[in-house]
Protein backbone atom coordinates (compact mmCIF):
# COMPACT_ATOMS: atom_id res chain seq x y z
CA UNK A 1 0.00 0.00 0.00
CA UNK A 2 1.21 3.47 -0.83
CA UNK A 3 -0.27 6.84 0.16
CA UNK A 4 0.22 10.09 -1.71
CA UNK A 5 -0.70 13.66 -0.83
CA UNK A 6 -2.32 15.47 -3.74
CA UNK A 7 -2.65 19.26 -4.09
CA UNK A 8 -4.70 21.05 -6.67
CA UNK A 9 -5.35 24.73 -7.33
CA UNK A 10 -8.66 25.87 -8.80
CA UNK A 11 -9.96 29.44 -9.07
CA UNK A 12 -7.24 30.69 -6.73
CA UNK A 13 -8.06 28.16 -4.02
CA UNK A 14 -5.81 25.20 -3.10
CA UNK A 15 -7.28 21.80 -2.28
CA UNK A 16 -5.41 18.85 -0.86
CA UNK A 17 -6.19 15.26 0.02
CA UNK A 18 -4.49 11.91 0.48
CA UNK A 19 -4.96 9.06 -1.94
CA UNK A 20 -4.06 5.48 -1.03
CA UNK A 21 -3.25 2.84 -3.60
CA UNK A 22 -3.63 -0.80 -2.63
CA UNK A 23 -2.44 -3.76 -4.70
CA UNK A 24 -5.43 -6.10 -4.70
CA UNK A 25 -4.00 -8.65 -7.12
CA UNK A 26 -2.48 -10.70 -4.29
CA UNK A 27 -5.50 -10.77 -1.98
CA UNK A 28 -5.77 -13.84 0.18
CA UNK A 29 -8.77 -15.12 2.07
CA UNK A 30 -8.35 -17.45 5.04
CA UNK A 31 -11.13 -19.76 6.26
CA UNK A 32 -11.03 -21.79 9.44
CA UNK A 33 -12.64 -25.24 9.27
CA UNK A 34 -13.30 -27.62 12.15
CA UNK A 35 -13.37 -31.41 11.91
CA UNK A 36 -15.97 -31.74 14.69
CA UNK A 37 -18.13 -28.63 14.63
CA UNK A 38 -17.91 -25.54 16.80
CA UNK A 39 -19.69 -26.46 20.03
CA UNK A 40 -18.26 -28.05 23.18
CA UNK A 41 -20.79 -29.16 25.83
CA UNK A 42 -19.70 -28.86 29.47
CA UNK A 43 -16.05 -28.60 28.45
CA UNK A 44 -16.16 -31.94 26.65
CA UNK A 45 -15.07 -32.36 23.06
CA UNK A 46 -12.13 -32.05 20.75
CA UNK A 47 -11.53 -30.99 17.18
CA UNK A 48 -8.87 -30.05 14.69
CA UNK A 49 -8.92 -26.51 13.33
CA UNK A 50 -7.65 -26.11 9.78
CA UNK A 51 -6.71 -22.81 8.17
CA UNK A 52 -7.49 -22.95 4.45
CA UNK A 53 -6.01 -20.20 2.31
CA UNK A 54 -7.49 -18.95 -0.97
CA UNK A 55 -6.26 -16.56 -3.65
CA UNK A 56 -8.38 -15.59 -6.66
CA UNK A 57 -10.76 -18.48 -5.91
CA UNK A 58 -8.03 -21.15 -5.83
CA UNK A 59 -6.70 -22.86 -2.72
CA UNK A 60 -3.11 -21.92 -1.89
CA UNK A 61 -0.85 -24.07 0.32
CA UNK A 62 -3.46 -26.84 0.35
CA UNK A 63 -3.78 -29.58 2.93
CA UNK A 64 -1.49 -32.56 2.36
CA UNK A 65 -4.00 -34.98 3.92
CA UNK A 66 -7.40 -35.14 5.57
CA UNK A 67 -6.13 -37.62 8.17
CA UNK A 68 -5.60 -36.09 11.63
CA UNK A 69 -4.65 -38.56 14.35
CA UNK A 70 -2.50 -39.34 17.38
CA UNK A 71 -1.41 -42.61 15.74
CA UNK A 72 -0.12 -43.24 12.23
CA UNK A 73 -2.42 -44.72 9.59
CA UNK A 74 -1.97 -48.45 9.01
CA UNK A 75 -0.87 -49.81 5.62
CA UNK A 76 -0.04 -46.43 4.01
CA UNK A 77 1.38 -46.12 0.54
CA UNK A 78 4.73 -44.41 -0.07
CA UNK A 79 4.30 -40.64 -0.19
CA UNK A 80 1.19 -40.60 2.04
CA UNK A 81 0.79 -37.77 4.56
CA UNK A 82 -1.06 -37.28 7.84
CA UNK A 83 -1.20 -34.66 10.59
CA UNK A 84 0.05 -36.14 13.86
CA UNK A 85 -1.46 -34.76 17.05
CA UNK A 86 0.43 -34.89 20.34
CA UNK A 87 -1.32 -35.25 23.68
CA UNK A 88 0.65 -32.37 25.22
CA UNK A 89 0.60 -29.88 22.32
CA UNK A 90 -1.95 -28.04 20.20
CA UNK A 91 0.41 -28.00 17.25
CA UNK A 92 0.27 -30.93 14.85
CA UNK A 93 3.20 -32.41 12.97
CA UNK A 94 3.01 -33.07 9.23
CA UNK A 95 4.18 -36.64 8.69
CA UNK A 96 5.09 -38.33 5.37
CA UNK A 97 5.51 -42.06 4.74
CA UNK A 98 8.77 -42.83 2.91
CA UNK A 99 7.78 -46.38 2.06
CA UNK A 100 9.31 -47.82 5.22
CA UNK A 101 8.83 -45.21 7.98
CA UNK A 102 6.95 -42.05 8.91
CA UNK A 103 9.06 -38.86 8.88
CA UNK A 104 8.34 -35.35 10.21
CA UNK A 105 8.31 -33.08 7.14
CA UNK A 106 6.78 -30.00 8.82
CA UNK A 107 9.90 -27.92 8.13
CA UNK A 108 10.77 -29.55 4.81
CA UNK A 109 11.13 -27.14 1.89
CA UNK A 110 9.99 -29.93 -0.43
CA UNK A 111 6.99 -31.30 1.50
CA UNK A 112 6.07 -28.78 4.21
CA UNK A 113 3.59 -25.94 3.92
CA UNK A 114 4.77 -22.77 2.20
CA UNK A 115 3.02 -20.32 4.54
CA UNK A 116 3.45 -19.69 8.26
CA UNK A 117 0.28 -20.08 10.39
CA UNK A 118 0.02 -18.55 13.87
CA UNK A 119 -3.09 -19.04 16.01
CA UNK A 120 -4.40 -16.70 18.71
CA UNK A 121 -7.41 -16.87 21.03
CA UNK A 122 -9.90 -14.26 22.23
CA UNK A 123 -12.37 -14.63 25.09
CA UNK A 124 -16.14 -14.06 25.05
CA UNK A 125 -15.56 -10.29 25.37
CA UNK A 126 -13.11 -10.17 22.47
CA UNK A 127 -10.10 -9.76 24.76
CA UNK A 128 -6.85 -11.55 23.85
CA UNK A 129 -6.08 -14.73 25.80
CA UNK A 130 -2.63 -16.18 26.51
CA UNK A 131 -1.38 -12.64 27.29
CA UNK A 132 -1.69 -11.91 23.56
CA UNK A 133 0.95 -14.52 22.73
CA UNK A 134 0.46 -17.20 20.09
CA UNK A 135 -1.68 -20.14 21.21
CA UNK A 136 -0.30 -22.54 18.58
CA UNK A 137 1.36 -22.65 15.17
CA UNK A 138 0.76 -24.67 12.03
CA UNK A 139 -1.85 -25.10 9.32
CA UNK A 140 -3.71 -27.65 11.47
CA UNK A 141 -4.05 -27.45 15.27
CA UNK A 142 -5.87 -29.59 17.82
CA UNK A 143 -8.05 -28.19 20.58
CA UNK A 144 -10.26 -29.63 23.29
CA UNK A 145 -12.80 -28.48 25.87
CA UNK A 146 -10.06 -27.21 28.20
CA UNK A 147 -9.13 -24.60 25.57
CA UNK A 148 -12.60 -23.03 25.61
CA UNK A 149 -14.19 -21.11 28.49
CA UNK A 150 -17.83 -20.27 27.68
CA UNK A 151 -16.90 -18.84 24.27
CA UNK A 152 -13.49 -18.62 22.62
CA UNK A 153 -12.68 -17.23 19.19
CA UNK A 154 -9.68 -18.71 17.39
CA UNK A 155 -7.90 -16.43 14.92
CA UNK A 156 -5.27 -17.61 12.45
CA UNK A 157 -2.66 -15.17 11.11
CA UNK A 158 -1.00 -16.25 7.86
CA UNK A 159 2.37 -15.00 6.62
Place the predicted regions along the sequence by residue.
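Surface-exposed receptor/substrate recognition regions of extracellular proteins
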Residues: 1-159
Amino acid sequence: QASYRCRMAYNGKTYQDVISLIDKTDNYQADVDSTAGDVFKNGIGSTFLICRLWQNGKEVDALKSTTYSVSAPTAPSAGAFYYKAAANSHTTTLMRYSGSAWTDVSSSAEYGHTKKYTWYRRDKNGEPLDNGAAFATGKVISINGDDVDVKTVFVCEVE
